[in-house]
């Protein structure tokens, strides 16, 4: 039996599990996920020739009778079962998380068509990687659940700042929906265009795209504009499944965010354009709620916006949930400028964007900074903005973002914006890019 021991950052917990396995099953092969080297872990599993393997977390312990009982359970396991989930009863269930499988059928995992261990950019929540595989396999396989006291999971103690239940409640729908999503053969007429502009965001891109694929409504199109990235963005994009709703365009040089948004605007086929930053993601029902509101919006409404969930990225790119951030029901230009208030999501009426010629390129910093503020302020002078009092966006706060790196430039840009007696027009949105 091959055993993967996961979450090995704590040496005491890891040593306890390794000593336990060495005692009860010295013939088993044990691998630890040190530094989470996905390539090495997946390569080892690819070469594995046994019918089943096991996953444990550092600190988990097995009883001395577990091995003999497991042999009997595997012999009786139906062929349609992907593995075994052990439960110890409701009394030990923490935070209402379902127990992930301990025993996995090797052929079932290989039939999934994807690696068992996903890269961090595909799933930035390491605690849920086994749950993700569980949901993914549920489409074609069943699972056997056994009440068993021979498995003693390590007691989990969450620090006060870790809102574990809220985190799980927000991430689980995306994992379940993504596992069940079916790609259309023909592109539906899009009701909304999603603009995802990226520059050197390869480490975040796939999770943002996955949140689009997991939407509860499927009549969208995703326009990805790569602003001449120098990282492995193109390799990540090439790994995406073929989906007629997704179009990609790569700039021949780095032009900045406003230029990219104008390109996306020129390509948009839907009446509404939703902006999605490459390091953020959408809740599963975001598009459904936005489109439901769009159906009742007046022609003068140029922007739909809502509240958002805030996540802070740690030094090791771990995400810490900070709660819901509410935005004002009425956005005033002066208040928006003075407070540098983030507005998310931003869902624009395409007709209104064309009426002001899209985003400006001749603003300070060439449209590379604060393009969200300038477009909202310009729209607010001639159109209505509508607030939805519900969180519709996941916003990641990270120190390496362009906005955080250039925060000292905001005062000068704000002064320039306030001095514009007559608000200028944008610089794009009419000419489609060559492909």
Model-derived features: positions:
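Short aromatic/hydrophobic "clamp" motif used to bind/position activated sugar donors
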Residues: 53, 273
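A recurrent flexible, glycine/aromatic-enriched loop bordering the glycosyltransferase active site
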Residues: 86-103, 329-347
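Conserved donor NDP-sugar-binding/catalytic core segment of glycosyltransferases
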Residues: 61-94, 287-319
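A conserved acidic beta->alpha catalytic loop
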Residues: 9-13, 34-36, 226-235, 253, ...
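Glycine-rich, basic loop-to-helix element that forms the pyrophosphate-binding segment
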Residues: 34-48, 251-268
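Acidic donor-binding loop at a coil-to-helix junction in glycosyltransferase catalytic cores
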Residues: 118-130, 365-375
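Short, acidic, metal-binding catalytic loop of nucleotide-sugar glycosyltransferases
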Residues: 16-28, 210-219
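N-proximal low-complexity "stem/linker" segments adjacent to membrane-targeting elements
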Residues: 1-19, 156-211
């Amino acid at each position: 039996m091959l055993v993967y021991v996961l979450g090995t950052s704590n040496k005491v917990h890891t040593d306890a599990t390794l000593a336990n396995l060495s005692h009860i099953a010295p013939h088993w092969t044990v691998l630890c996920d040190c530094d989470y080297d996905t390539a090495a872990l997946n390569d080892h599993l690819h070469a594995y020739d046994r019918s089943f393997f096991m996953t444990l977390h550092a600190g988990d312990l097995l009883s001395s009778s577990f091995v003999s009982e497991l042999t009997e359970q595997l012999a009786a396991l139906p062929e349609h079962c992907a593995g075994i989930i052990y439960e110890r009863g409701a009394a030990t269930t923490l935070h209402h998380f379902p127990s992930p499988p301990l025993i996995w059928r090797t052929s079932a995992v290989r039939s999934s068509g994807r690696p068992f261990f996903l890269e961090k950019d595909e799933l930035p929540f390491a605690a849920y990687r086994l749950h993700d595989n569980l949901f993914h396999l549920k489409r074609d396989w069943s699972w056997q659940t056994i009440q068993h006291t021979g498995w003693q999971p390590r007691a989990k103690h969450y620090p006060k700042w870790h809102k574990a239940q809220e985190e799980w409640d927000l991430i689980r729908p995306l994992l379940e929906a993504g596992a069940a999503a079916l790609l259309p053969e023909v592109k539906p007429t899009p009701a909304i265009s999603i603009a995802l502009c990226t520059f050197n965001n390869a480490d975040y891109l796939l999770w943002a795209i996955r949140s689009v694929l997991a939407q509860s409504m499927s009549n969208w199109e995703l326009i990805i504009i790569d602003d001449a990235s120098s990282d492995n963005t193109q390799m990540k994009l090439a790994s995406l499944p073929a989906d007629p709703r997704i179009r990609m365009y790569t700039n021949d040089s780095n032009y900045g965010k406003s230029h990219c948004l104008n390109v996306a605007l020129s390509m948009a086929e839907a009446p509404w354009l939703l902006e999605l930053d490459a390091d953020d993601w959408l809740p599963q029902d975001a598009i459904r709620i936005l489109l439901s509101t769009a159906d009742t919006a007046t022609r003068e409404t140029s922007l739909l916006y809502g509240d958002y969930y805030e996540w802070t990225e740690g030094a090791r790119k771990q995400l810490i949930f900070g709660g819901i951030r509410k935005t004002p029901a009425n956005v005033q230009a002066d208040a928006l400028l003075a407070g540098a208030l983030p507005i998310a999501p931003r869902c624009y009426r395409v007709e209104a964007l064309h009426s002001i010629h899209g985003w400006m390129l001749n603003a300070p910093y060439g449209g590379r900074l604060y393009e969200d503020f300038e477009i909202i302020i310009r729209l607010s002078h001639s159109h209505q903005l509508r607030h939805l009092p519900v969180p519709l966006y996941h916003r990641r706060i990270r120190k390496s973002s362009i906005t955080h790196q250039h925060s000292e430039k905001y005062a000068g840009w704000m002064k320039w914006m306030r001095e514009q007696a007559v608000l200028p027009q944008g610089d794009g949105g009419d000419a489609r890019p060559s492909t």
